[in-house]
A protein has these predicted regions:
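Gly/Ser/Thr-rich helix-start
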Residues: 2-4, 80, 131, 157
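A conserved active-site cap/scaffold subdomain adjacent to cofactor or substrate pockets
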Residues: 102, 122-182
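Short, surface-exposed amphipathic charged segments that create phosphate/polyanion-binding patches used
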Residues: 13-16, 67-73, 114-120, 142-143, ...
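Short, surface-exposed, charge-dense and proline/glycine-enriched linear segments
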Residues: 30-31, 62, 88, 132-136, ...
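Metallocofactor- and cofactor-centric catalytic cores in central/energy metabolism, strongly enriched
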Residues: 1-70, 84, 91, 96, ...
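Phosphate/pyrophosphate-binding betaalpha-module
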Residues: 76, 80-140
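Short hydrophobic alpha-helical runs that function as membrane-insertion/retention elements
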Residues: 54-55, 74, 100, 152-155
Length: 183
């Protein structure tokens, strides 16, 4: 769901945004990120204490904020491949000089690799998010499947999509196939 990227944002990244917000920098970030706890407090706490935190729905709004002020604006970017594209597009398209990006973006295959390689992992296969695969292409998961010996099925979030993915994943596991399938 929409809160997933904030769930995997590292505490030091949140702490860095909090420090900036309390030093006069305007932090622009997604609403869910404001409530994520850092080591001692959240961005919401920092805002209540005078920190400069702005909730935005896209990086485009952070760009607008930067154009409306001479203050330093930092977009605290979180998310996976789907939100990284918009962040990268702004970074490559002559953003305002007073706009910086604090990237907390995550890369799905790297996260899967950590889970697959964990010594206590008992996972036999993975269902990968279809919306991320739309950005990267589902073939991105082929090296992972080959390296780990675990199948990957790409699916959407609708109940039937997930059920179809589970069925295909069970079939691949039963057949001993470490391949990638787009459900």
């Amino acid at each position: 769901g929409p809160g997933c990227p904030v769930c995997v944002t590292d505490v030091p990244e949140v702490d860095e945004a909090i420090v900036l917000a309390t030093q006069g920098v305007r932090i622009a970030t997604y609403g869910d990120m404001v409530k994520v706890p850092g080591t001692v407090r959240s961005l919401a706490d920092a805002q209540a204490e005078g920190g400069r935190v702005h909730v935005v729905y896209s990086i485009a709004q952070a760009v607008e904020l930067a154009r409306e002020t001479d203050d330093e604006v930092v977009f605290f970017a979180s998310g996976f491949e789907t939100t990284a594209v918009a962040t990268a597009a702004v970074a490559l398209d002559a953003p305002p000089a007073n706009l910086s990006i604090l990237s907390a973006h995550k890369y799905v295959p790297a996260a899967m690799e950590v889970v697959a390689q964990h010594p206590e992992s008992r996972i036999d296969g993975f269902i990968a998010a279809g919306h991320a695969a739309v950005v990267t292409g589902w073939a991105l998961f082929e090296p992972f499947a080959a390296r780990t010996g675990k199948p990957v099925v790409v699916a959407g979030f609708e109940p039937l999509d997930i059920l179809a993915a589970v069925l295909k994943l069970v079939e691949l596991i039963a057949a001993g196939e470490a391949s990638v399938f787009n459900a």
